[in-house]
């Protein structure tokens, strides 16, 4: 009888365990998703404004919380502290986050970044090329895609960070410093590139296109979240895809919407959209190769303290499923 009781207890625990595991993956057990969003003009902002994420998730009993950031690196603090589930960031924060051991996955390519990053100088600065930055003060957000772009652009002409004075500033602070002449140059991304050139007379010294330097952007998810709620990761990507498609099909309306939300001149917005085509795609081998080259460069220049294999954080499973479901006729 004692043996039978032991077997019965074991079976009960086994069944309880199965039930618990099933519940952990059930979206009905999920109460809230936290989405990080930057100041960029991204379809993520369109979806936020139109309430598409709320429509898709709240009908399943899941609340949507938006968390605003100025750049990518602080978002990794949120991921590491379990205060963020999804985010979209540039290439450099992804590499720094992986090198720091933060647990996340890249689940989609959100832009190629060819024209999205550049180095600004004032029109009358006298600086004609990247070599002219030697000895100058340059504003940049540490660990951002602009940070990586600056280091690579300097390296291309035989300079390093030791040849310039790096002033680490987040975009809002950097804009003031650049406009009042406290710094000589600013390594930054859109929409700031268009805003400064069109409204304040700045000029783009170089960008990704002129230097052939890619700065791709990625959609990220916290690894534990993706393991426990895979269906919700697919749902997120499908909603984002809806916003990407809508922007491409309603470009003028999208420009009006961004202009209203950000209080920007529509012509500035149109220029930003011309330079930053949104994507929601599988992370290709070419992008992985470019990321690995960036990671190796950052290790060589001591921006990160260990070598990493960037493939370790790539997971195309969710985007493949999301795109398949979208093509079969279901946006959400």
UniProtKB/Swiss-Prot annotation:
* Bilayer topology: Lipid-anchor
Where is this protein chiefly located?
Answer: membrane
Q: SUPFAM superfamilies given for it?
A: Periplasmic binding protein-like II
The Gene Ontology terms for molecular function here are:
ATPase-coupled transmembrane transporter activity
Q: Pfam family example for this protein?
A: NMT1
Q: Where is the lipid attached (S-diacylglycerol cysteine)?
A: 18
Q: Which UniProt keywords apply?
A: Cell membrane, Lipoprotein, Membrane, Palmitate, Signal, Transport
Q: InterPro entries from the xrefs?
A: ABC_SsuA_sub-bd, Solute-binding_3/MltF_N, SsuA/THI5
- Location(s), subcellular: Cell membrane
Matching entries from PROSITE patterns are given as: PROKAR_LIPOPROTEIN
Tell me, using the record's free text, what induces this protein: Repressed by sulfate and cysteine.
**Residues where lipid is bound covalently (N-palmitoyl cysteine):** 18
Superkingdom as given in the UniProt entry: Bacteria
Provide a GO CC annotation, any one: plasma membrane
Signal sequence: where? 1-17
What is this protein's function per UniProt?
Part of a binding-protein-dependent transport system for aliphatic sulfonates. Putative binding protein.
Q: Identify the NCBIfam families for this entry.
A: SsuA_fam
Query: What family does the Swiss-Prot or TrEMBL record give for this protein?
Result: Belongs to the bacterial solute-binding protein SsuA/TauA family.
Protein name in UniProt: Putative aliphatic sulfonates-binding protein
Q: Which organism is it from?
A: Bacillus subtilis (strain 168)
Q: Please name the taxonomic classification of the source.
A: Bacteria, Bacillati, Bacillota, Bacilli, Bacillales
